[in-house]
Amino acid sequence: MTSNLTHLNEKGEAHMVDVGGKAVTKRTARARSYVNMTAETLAVVANGDVAKGDVFATARIAGIQAAKKCADLIPLCHPLMLTRVTVDITIEANANRLCIEAQCELDGKTGVEMEALTACSVAALTVYDMCKALDKGIVISDTRLISKTGGKSGDWFYSE
């Protein structure tokens, strides 16, 4: 059972994977989250009228910062020298939600999936924090990996 779970040793104990012998390759990962809210709250966000400030700029910076701190938050993640982190937030007015997409890149020995997922998650939590006075019913949903490239396991793309 543990042979496919790289974070478990032969005794079933959690450990950080040794990536020392792996080749350095270009690696990317893209993740997505949605933040669902009332139409009224979305209008306030879109107009830039949230009392706490610019929701988009604050969430974007929070997501970037979170990607850089991923190894401090998730115990078995390796500290990485990210070469690029982007966080894009778009309004989907027809669905009363924001779509948050994060992309992380590096030239390294391990992937950046957790960094992209963490960036999306923290950006979404930041939107919630900034808007909770307007709407207690905000829902963060469908956080998922959209794609990953590079590494021994190759490329992967989510399909709906």
Curated annotation (Swiss-Prot):
- Asked whether the keyword Lyase is assigned, the reply is yes
Active site residues per record? D129
GO terms in the biological process aspect are: Mo-molybdopterin cofactor biosynthetic process
Keywords assigned by UniProt, alphabetized:
Lyase, Molybdenum cofactor biosynthesis
Q: In the UniProt record, does the keyword Methyltransferase occur?
A: no
InterPro entries according to UniProt: MoaC, MoaC_bact/euk, MoaC_sf, MoCo_biosynth_MoaA/MoaC, Mopterin_CF_biosynth-C_dom
- Enzyme Commission code(s) on record: 4.6.1.17
Family annotation (Gene3D superfamilies): Molybdopterin cofactor biosynthesis C (MoaC) domain
Name the Gene Ontology molecular function terms of this record: cyclic pyranopterin monophosphate synthase activity; GTP 3',8'-cyclase activity
Can you tell me which residues bind substrate? L76, C77, H78, M114, E115
Reaction(s) the record says it catalyses: (8S)-3',8-cyclo-7,8-dihydroguanosine 5'-triphosphate = cyclic pyranopterin phosphate + diphosphate
Membrane spanning residue stretches: none
Q: Which pathway, per its entry?
A: Cofactor biosynthesis; molybdopterin biosynthesis
Q: What does this protein do?
A: Catalyzes the conversion of (8S)-3',8-cyclo-7,8-dihydroguanosine 5'-triphosphate to cyclic pyranopterin monophosphate (cPMP).
Instruction: Please give the NCBIfam families that the UniProt record associates with this protein.
Output: moaC, PRK09364.1
Family the UniProt entry places it in = Belongs to the MoaC family.
Q: Report quaternary structure and partners.
A: Homohexamer; trimer of dimers.
Designated name of the protein: Cyclic pyranopterin monophosphate synthase
- The species this protein belongs to is Saccharophagus degradans (strain 2-40 / ATCC 43961 / DSM 17024)
